[in-house]
Regions:
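N-terminal secretory signal peptides that target proteins for export/translocation
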Residues: 1-8
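Beta-propeller blade termini and top-face loops
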Residues: 27-363
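Bacterial N-terminal signal peptides
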Residues: 9-26
Length: 363
């Protein structure tokens, strides 16, 4: 479980602009000294923007050996432990980018590790990535496998038996429109990619969940968002849950029982599927009528369980206990724990020395 630290961001552009004004100031009357002479010995020092090295965005755990864990950080690269967290080593420092969105390990081959770059959260300090990376030797070496224009990859899911097949959730540019958003699929280990779900240039996908019993069935959380220098627009009519049953060839937007069924802007959505019964799907949905939702028929209909959804634009992760479909966790500034499927929550189960939980994995 992660504890995130925050730092003050100071706009470097504003500092450079101020210096530029001094250089471009009028020189005044003839005979005055050139103002650039006063700057010739000026030494620059870095004062920002700050990067979030301490914030953890995701875990990748080898399920056959949970002592092996990969951790992806907001701006500190990828770290690996082979002794259940006693010691850690950086394994991504030689790559061109250090901001991580998601880590996925192939269930059929734990040596195959995928990293999606670009922090998926929406802070002004969130750094953008340059695509998706693949390791065939458990993190010793990496190869960039494309998707550079996606900027932020929120989730990667891999076929349980064929490590060549995977899907990537692409959020796209945080600060403006771009077409490289949605869901991308590869069937050849990343050599080629197809954009199998595209909604529009403003709506990306923040989360994907794959049916463990039928891997051609997937749920995608579409998310319309836009950061500006002085604000954030975290929602729109095209956000929502989309479902495919044919490996991404066709998709439909799920609506029945969800808060946006009758309209209204929808924000960020988190998804999870119960491992013992894939009919059961949970979602936390940002909406004026949002909260925690449950489906018992693979997403065809939904029931609102409660209003809890802690600061969805910054968290929005929900996890189901693998042995109890009524025991769920929602992450936020505190850890929210429910024993009744999300009707009620307690924040007393987990104590922390610092707020903010962004990632969780349950054995």
């Amino acid at each position: 479980m992660d504890h995130a630290w925050f730092a003050l961001k100071m706009g470097l552009a504003a500092v450079v602009f101020s210096v530029g004004l001094a250089i471009l100031a009028p020189v005044g009357t003839v005979g005055q000294s050139n103002p650039t002479d006063k700057l010739k010995n000026l030494e620059f020092r870095e004062i920002g923007p700050a990067v979030m090295g301490g914030r953890i965005d995701d875990f990748g755990v080898v399920e056959s050996n949970p002592n092996i864990v990969y951790v992806g950080t907001a701006s500190g690269g990828v770290w690996k432990t082979t002794n259940n967290g006693t010691t850690w080593e950086p394994v991504f420092d030689k790559e061109d980018v250090s901001t991580i969105g998601d880590i996925a390990i192939a269930p059929s081959d734990p040596a195959v590790v995928w990293v999606g770059t670009g922090e998926p959260n929406n802070r002004q300090s969130s750094s953008w990535g340059d695509g998706i990376y693949k390791s065939l030797d458990a993190g010793k070496t990496w190869q960039k496998m494309g998707l550079g224009a996606t900027h932020h990859i929120g989730r990667i899911v891999i076929h349980p038996k064929n490590p060549e097949i995977l899907y990537a959730a692409a959020l796209g540019h945080l600060w403006g429109p771009n077409p490289e958003r949605g869901v991308y699929k590869t069937t050849d280990g990343g050599k080629t990619w197809n954009q199998v779900l595209k909604i529009n240039d403003d709506t990306g996908v923040s989360d994907i969940a794959m049916d463990p019993e039928s891997p051609d069935t997937l749920y995608a959380a579409a998310y319309e968002r836009r950061r500006t220098p002085f604000g954030f627009n975290g929602g729109g009519p095209d956000s929502g849950i989309y479902k495919t049953t044919d490996g991404g060839t066709t998709w439909k937007k799920l609506t029945k029982g969800l808060p946006y069924e009758n309209g209204g802007d929808t924000g960020r959505i988190g998804l999870d599927i119960y491992r013992k019964d894939s009919n059961i799907v949970y979602a936390i949905v940002q909406h004026e009528k949002g909260g925690t939702y449950r489906s018992d028929d693979k997403g065809e209909t939904w029931k609102k369980m409660g209003d809890t959804n802690p600061r969805p634009s910054y968290y929005s992760q929900i996890r189901i206990d693998p042995n109890n479909d009524l025991r769920i966790w929602e992450l936020g500034a505190q850890m929210f724990y429910s024993e009744d499927g999300g009707k009620t929550f307690s924040t007393q189960r987990v104590k922390s020395i610092h707020g903010d939980f962004h990632a969780m994995w349950i054995d």
